[in-house]
Amino acid sequence: MKYIGAHVSAAGGLANAAIRAAEIDATAFALFTKNQRQWRAAPLTAQIIDDFKAACEKYHYSPAQILPHDSYLINLGHPVSEALEKSRDAFIDEMQRCEQLGLSLLNFHPGSHLQQIPEEECLARIAESINIALEKTQGVTAVIENTAGQGSNLGFRFEHLAAIIDGVDDKSRVGVCIDTCHAFAAGYDLRTTDECEKTFADFERVVGFTYLRGMHLNDAKSAFGSRVDRHHSLGEGNIGHDAFRWIMQDDRFDGIPLILETINPDIWAEEIAWLKAQQTAKVVA
């Protein structure tokens, strides 16, 4: 079964994220459990936790259908020790918040070397950061998102994701989220069903579908291989509709949150309905 949704706002209370997801007929959703552009957040109260769990139960969202995202400020591969510790502490807090909310996944961008340390050292720091967070939490899987490779961000090659996973001690609590826009911008073609087959055969060979715990379904304003992260609405960008139809008809993408981060929230309900309909539509080769 496909879990299809969007990254919805939690403004006014975390429970509102589940309500907003239900309003667009989503069967999955993503959210921030705190302000994504601030380091510190007030601890979750029992009331906030209870309200969130009640809303999820009311609208039939299990932890497998929810993909929380951490703060954009966190850099788990930071080259400077003091800044690395700050990021690690913030990441542990994010994991603990998920734990409190009964959530089983936490999606995050791997990190950046900032042109100060080699890629390999940065990837090792990211893996070590994950190990530290996993030791201090229970039941939450660290879900590494592929990146477009803007600036000094790592994670734009499947090999980067594999290297991080290789350095994580508890393989049962690490996974990946593939963002279609990021993959395309990083040089993984998705414009035809044949290219989709090739790209995900590469993913299976290097990382493995066993680690796929979520997807971000975004078309791309950015050009193929541009290393620029610019999302677009489905079918309106440089990827086109075929990739998303193909994903909807491939059972390797069942049972994980498939999340829209497309640029127009006003049409998320339409995009979700379209994605659902593609499960039985004819694929044009």
From Swiss-Prot:
Recorded superkingdom: Bacteria
Entry's cofactor comment: Binds 3 Zn(2+) ions.
Keywords, comma-separated and alphabetical: DNA damage, DNA repair, Endonuclease, Hydrolase, Metal-binding, Nuclease, Zinc
Enzyme type, top EC level: hydrolase
Residue numbers binding Zn(2+) 2: 145, 179, 216, 261
Binding site for Zn(2+) 1: 69, 109, 145
Cofactors that this protein relies on: Zn(2+)
GO biological process: base-excision repair
Pfam families from the UniProt entry: AP_endonuc_2
Catalytic activity: Endonucleolytic cleavage to 5'-phosphooligonucleotide end-products
UniProt EC number: 3.1.21.2
One function term, GO molecular function aspect: zinc ion binding
Binding site for Zn(2+) 3: 182, 229, 231
Family per record: Belongs to the AP endonuclease 2 family.
Function: Endonuclease IV plays a role in DNA repair. It cleaves phosphodiester bonds at apurinic or apyrimidinic (AP) sites, generating a 3'-hydroxyl group and a 5'-terminal sugar phosphate.
Record-given protein name: Probable endonuclease 4
Organism: Citrobacter koseri (strain ATCC BAA-895 / CDC 4225-83 / SGSC4696)
